[in-house]
Every structure is written in structure tokens, then in C-alpha cells.
Amino acid sequence: MHELLTKDNITSTDLQTLLEAREKGEADFLLVDVREDMEYEMGHIKGVDMLKPTSMFQQWAESFLDENKDKAVIFTCRTGSRSGQVQHVFKSNGMERAINHYGGIVTYSGDIER
């Protein structure tokens, strides 16, 4: 397991490192954007696996936890605030490798898809 996947919070530089490692098969994780649809469509980090808006958290949280409890999951948003809240909830409910992308997309200098 990649050492960055043991942290509670990672920086944008860390995320770029992990995305590059995942492309080479050296890291395994899910990258989940918790912003709203409109924000996502305006631009998102290349490599995001799924969009799970926080406004719909109650609808997707339980099944997401059941399906991904044992995986490393990195949550991202615009600044790291919403993703930090989501990460805290999942960590508190037994997802040991829930990770917050601290700083969010506004601090990310890697590839953005529109």
C-alpha cells in the first residue's frame, strides 16, 4: 500500500503523486468528488472515479460505506471543507482509509477535465 494512503489528509501534490502511481498500478484507491453537479461540470480533477454530491449525502452514504468500507477512498471538493466533513463521517463509521484532499481543486495544479 502506498504510504500516502495511510494519512487522514493529503495535499494536492500528494494527490498528483497518487494519481500517477495509480496509473502505473502502484496505488489502489477511489477518488470521489463531493461537489454539486454544476461545479463538477465546470471542471474536475482528471482521474475522479465518481461524483457524489454532499446535498444528496443521505441518499448515497450508507450504500457507499457498505460497498467501499475496506478500500482507500480520497474525497475532494472545491476547498477541502465539504470533503473533510464527508471524510470525518465515514472515518467515524469504520472506513479506516477515508482520506480528505486538503485544499481541494482550487489548490490542484494537475490535469483538470471540463
Regions found by a protein language model. Name each.
Residues F75-T76:
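Short, surface-exposed ligand- or partner-binding patches at beta-edge/loop junctions that are enriched
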Residues M1-L30, D37-A72, S81-R114:
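Rhodanese-like catalytic fold shared by cysteine-dependent sulfurtransferases
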